[in-house]
Regions:
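Acidic/glycine-enriched edge-of-secondary-structure segments
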Residues: 2-7, 63-80, 98, 202-210, ...
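Peripheral docking tails and interdomain loops at the edges
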Residues: 3-4, 340-384
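Redox- and metal-dependent alpha/beta enzyme cores, enriched for Fe-S-associated oxidoreductases
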Residues: 41-42, 47-59, 241-304, 308-313
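A charged, amphipathic alpha-helical module
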Residues: 1-34, 142, 146, 150-274, ...
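Acidic/His-rich segments in extracytoplasmic proteins that coordinate ligands and/or metal ions
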Residues: 83-154
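Hydrophobic, well-ordered secondary-structure elements that form the walls
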Residues: 324
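A short, acidic, amphipathic alpha-helical segment used as a generic capping/interface helix at domain edges
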Residues: 88, 303-320, 337-338
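An N-terminal, globular interaction/scaffold subdomain
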Residues: 40-92, 97, 112
Length: 384
């Protein structure tokens, strides 16, 4: 990632996201800490923090091949689980002390089956995520979280009390608030941060101890006040999509003259735009309500598309967005349908929309540049 940002905290974020194993995880492990890998932002990582574990969001950063994992998946599975599983088969996830999967989609669901069959991780569980966002589904997920809570206590010999859960929720909410403050700076006419520079900040929060991340985030917010952004961008853009942890994708977009000022992705605002409710009596009930209903959902949740498009429009207005780019991993059926509906709604709202299909590991830069250039020209044409 090319950047002019001079900040020790920002450098730490970049180091934590440049690969899978990073200095922060190494230090945690050397001190005797345990690491819990997990797929999907609907897994309640507060539970791991309360158990004294380091939550680590699974990714395939640095992967160059799916040679080993191709035998584990069909030819219509997307490249995210392929690359992530390949890294595991190469031994790059041997530092994990456990893994929690979830039935967020059939592609990720297959990781659970293959992980159990081929890897020796002693604690591997799968959570059952409901399909809707109503009261019965909150009750269902409440039971799922309590089930996982009991399994963690038994396997790791820890006690996850309500008090420890509330402490974890408070810490995670404080981090969410700090992340929102980072995004606030992107509302200016000359944002001091590009989209490509913001992404490592967000991914780092899922790749290092939470207290350490909070401290670095506070330091960075002190540094960002000294940064000066450049103006004259062709358009203010928003990214909507799912599994996007690679800054290079945004770099290519921004090299064409646009600047990404906000997003609705599972490594972006959907993680932190709204907090867990700390006013209820039961911390598990608070988590169940948050992960099923309170936080902005993704296409995995049925019947919630009207709220999702309202959320996108709300952010687009707040950040003065000129156009929206929908990114989708090839073979992701959920986002394929979602982007079709999003495109229809945004056309009615007269907001330019471009859908870009991609592989998990960056490729096809020439085609990406051409399509983004044409999109920016369309936006500029609408102004004249």
């Amino acid at each position: 990632l090319e950047t002019k940002i001079k900040s020790e905290a920002f450098q730490k974020f970049c180091e934590a996201t440049a690969g899978i194993m990073n200095p922060e995880v190494e230090a945690w492990k050397q001190a005797g800490g345990k690491v819990m890998g997990y797929f999907c932002s609907t897994v309640p990582e507060e539970l791991f923090t309360a158990a004294g574990l380091l939550p680590f969001r699974m990714r395939g950063t640095g992967s160059t091949s799916t040679e080993l994992s191709d035998a584990c998946f069909s030819n219509i599975n997307c490249s995210y689980p392929r690359h992530t599983m390949n890294e595991a088969l190469l031994g790059n996830y041997d530092f994990l002390d456990g893994l929690v999967c979830i039935n967020s989609c059939d592609h990720v669901r297959r990781v659970y089956d293959n992980w159990i069959a081929q890897l020796g991780t002693t604690f591997v569980r799968v959570m059952s995520l409901p399909r809707k966002v109503e009261a019965p589904q909150i009750d269902w997920y409440y039971d799922e979280i309590n089930l996982l809570r009991g399994q963690l206590q038994e396997h790791f010999g820890v006690e996850i009390t309500d008090e420890r859960l509330w402490e974890a929720i408070k810490l995670h909410n404080e981090i969410r608030e700090l992340q929102k403050k980072v995004y606030e700076y992107r509302k200016s006419d000359a944002p001091p941060l590009s989209g490509a520079e913001t992404l490592p900040i967000m991914v780092a929060g899922l790749s290092m101890p939470k207290e350490r991340y909070k401290t670095l985030l506070q330091q960075f917010l002190g540094d960002i006040e000294k940064l000066k952004g450049g103006g004259g961008h062709r358009a203010r853009l928003m990214i909507v999509g799912g599994e996007l942890d690679d800054p290079e994708f945004m770099e290519v977009i921004e090299e064409q003259g646009g600047i990404v000022v906000t997003d609705s992705t599972c490594f972006g605002t959907r993680l932190m735009w709204r907090p867990v409710d700390e006013s209820v009596d039961d911390p598990v009930r608070a988590l169940a309500s948050y992960y099923i209903y309170d936080r902005p959902s993704c296409p995995r949740m049925y019947g919630d598309q009207p709220r999702r498009i309202d959320y996108i429009k709300e952010l687009a207005k707040e950040f003065r967005v000129d156009g929206i780019i929908g990114e989708r991993l090839i073979f992701c059926d959920q986002w394929l349908v979602e982007h079709y509906m999003t495109g229809m709604d945004l056309k009615e709202a007269e907001i330019p929309f471009l859908q870009l299909d991609r592989e998990y590991i960056m490729g096809g830069k020439g085609q990406l540049r051409t399509r983004v250039q044409a999109f920016l020209e369309t936006i500029e044409g609408m102004r004249s």
